[in-house]
From Swiss-Prot:
Family label: Belongs to the phosphatidylethanolamine-binding protein family. Mitochondrion-specific ribosomal protein mL38 subfamily.
Subcellular location per the Swiss-Prot or TrEMBL entry: Mitochondrion
CDD domains: PEBP_euk
Main location group: mitochondrion
Keyword Mitochondrion: yes
The entry's keywords: Coiled coil, Mitochondrion, Ribonucleoprotein, Ribosomal protein, Transit peptide
Regions annotated as coiled coil: 99-127
Subunit and partners: Component of the mitochondrial ribosome large subunit (39S) which comprises a 16S rRNA and about 50 distinct proteins.
Pfam families recorded: PBP (PF01161)
InterPro entries: PEBP, PEBP-like_sf, PEBP_euk
Protein name per its UniProtKB record: Large ribosomal subunit protein mL38
One CC-aspect GO term: mitochondrial large ribosomal subunit
Transit peptide feature, positions: 1-26
Length: 380
C-alpha cells in the first residue's frame, strides 16, 4: 500500500521542482507597458461600472480592440506575413491588353454559348466534348506564363540560374523528344524524362515574328561532377531566324543528359532568349563533337550577364531526369571515362550517454552501446 503513496508524493515533488525551476530560470523581464485590465480595482467589484446592455458592451469591446497596444495579439503574431524580397524582373514586358475589351469578349462568348441550343442540350445530356487543344492554347495565352513562373520558383530555377532574378516566360516553348517512330515524349514544367527518351535532339517549336532572332540553350543544373555551383551545357543554338530552329547556329552540339548513378534527380532547363540584334557568340563556341566535360562547364548567370544588353529571356521549359542504363553508354562510349557511382552514407544513429542504472528502460537498452550486433534480448 505504501508504494502508490510514495510514487504519488515523488511525482508531485518532481512536478513542483520542475515548475519552480523553470519559473526561476525564465528570467522574466518587466512588461514594456501596462498589462490588460491593470487599471481595474479588483478589491471592490461592486463599485465597477456595469454595462447593463450587450450593445454597450459590444461598442466598448470594439473600441478597445481598435485601440493601439504595445503588445501583439495572437492573430498579429501568427497571421503576420513578411514581405518577400522584391526580385528583379529581367523578362519581356507584359502585353498591353485592354480590360474593357477582355470583358466585352467574355460577355460575347457567354451570350453565344447561351444562344447555342445544341451545346446546351449536349451539356444537359452530358455528351458535350471540350477541345483540349483550344483550352491549352487559351491557358498559355492568359494565365499559363504565370503558372510556369510559379513552378520555376518552386523548383529553384531562378535561384540557381539567375541568382534570384525572375522573369515571366511569355513565349510558349514546346519541346518534345521522339521516342520510336510515332511516339513523342513532351517536356512540360517538371515532368520526368529518362535519359533513354532524351537521347536524340528534341523538336522545339514556338511562335515568333518573321525577322526576329532567338537563342536556345539546354543546361543541367545539378549534374556537375567537380564544381557545386556550375552547370553542364548540353545544347546551344544561337541567332535562330524566327521559329526555324534547324537554321540556327550550332554553338554547342547536343549531348544527352547523363545523371550519375546514385546522385538522385537532376533538373534540366530549356531557356529561350529573344535577341535584339545579331550577336557574335564565337567566344562561347564549342568544338563539334564536344565530349570533354571541362569544355561544357557553363554558368547561365555569367552567360546572360555577358549578353544582357542584346537579349532577353522569353521562354522556359524544364524536366527532371535520373539515371538509367543508357547513362553507362554515354560515360564509356561518348565521354570516354569511367562512370562515377554515388552512394548515400547515412550518419551513425545518435544515442545519449549510457546510464549506469537505466531505470525503466527495455531489455534492448544495452544493444545501443554494444560493438557487436548480437542482441542481448532473449539471452539473459
Amino acid at each position: 500500500m505504501a508504494a502508490p503513496w510514495w510514487r504519488a508524493a515523488l511525482c508531485g515533488c518532481r512536478r513542483w521542482r520542475g515548475f519552480s525551476t523553470s519559473a526561476v530560470l525564465g528570467r522574466r523581464t518587466p512588461p514594456l507597458g501596462p498589462m490588460p485590465n491593470s487599471d481595474i480595482d479588483l478589491s471592490n467589484l461592486e463599485r465597477l461600472e456595469k454595462y447593463r446592455s450587450f450593445d454597450r458592451y459590444r461598442r466598448r469591446a470594439e473600441q478597445e480592440a481598435q485601440a493601439p497596444h504595445w503588445w501583439r495579439t495572437y492573430r498579429e503574431h501568427f497571421g503576420e506575413k513578411t514581405d518577400p524580397e522584391e526580385k528583379i524582373d529581367i523578362g519581356l514586358p507584359p502585353p498591353k491588353v485592354s480590360r474593357t475589351q477582355q470583358l466585352l469578349e467574355r460577355k460575347q462568348a457567354i451570350r453565344e454559348l447561351r444562344a447555342n441550343v445544341e451545346e446546351e442540350r449536349a451539356a444537359r445530356l452530358r455528351t458535350a466534348s471540350v477541345p483540349l487543344d483550344a483550352v491549352r492554347a487559351e491557358w498559355e495565352r492568359t494565365c499559363g506564363p504565370y503558372h510556369k513562373q510559379r513552378l520555376a520558383e518552386y523548383y529553384g530555377l531562378y535561384r540557381d540560374l539567375f541568382h534570384g532574378a525572375t522573369f515571366v516566360p511569355r513565349v510558349p516553348l514546346h519541346v518534345a523528344y521522339a521516342v520510336g517512330e510515332d511516339d513523342l515524349m513532351p517536356v512540360y514544367c517538371g515532368n520526368e524524362v529518362t535519359p533513354t527518351e532524351a537521347a536524340q535532339v528534341p523538336e522545339v517549336t514556338y511562335e515568333a515574328e518573321e525577322g526576329s532572332l532567338w537563342t536556345l540553350l539546354l543546361t543541367s543544373l545539378d549534374g556537375h561532377l567537380l564544381e557545386p555551383d556550375a552547370e553542364y551545357l548540353h545544347w546551344l543554338l544561337t541567332n535562330i531566324p524566327g521559329n526555324r530552329v534547324a537554321e540556327g547556329q550550332v554553338t554547342c552540339p547536343y549531348l544527352p543528359p547523363f545523371p550519375a548513378r546514385g546522385s538522385g534527380i537532376h533538373r534540366l532547363a530549356f531557356l529561350l532568349f529573344k535577341q535584339d540584334q545579331p550577336i557574335d557568340f564565337s567566344e562561347d563556341a564549342r568544338p563539334s563533337p564536344c565530349y570533354q566535360l571541362a569544355q561544357r562547364t557553363f554558368r547561365t548567370f555569367d552567360f546572360y550577364k555577358k549578353y544582357q544588353e542584346a537579349m532577353t529571356p522569353a521562354g522556359l521549359s524544364f524536366f527532371q531526369c535520373r539515371w538509367d542504363d543508357s547513362v553507362t553508354y554515354i560515360f564509356h562510349q561518348l565521354l570516354d571515362m569511367r562512370e562515377p557511382v554515388f552512394e548515400f552514407v547515412r550518419p551513425p544513429p545518435y544515442h545519449p550517454k549510457q546510464k549506469r542504472f537505466p531505470h525503466r528502460q527495455p531489455l534492448r537498452y544495452l544493444d545501443r552501446y554494444r560493438d557487436s550486433h548480437e542482441p542481448t534480448y532473449g539471452i539473459y
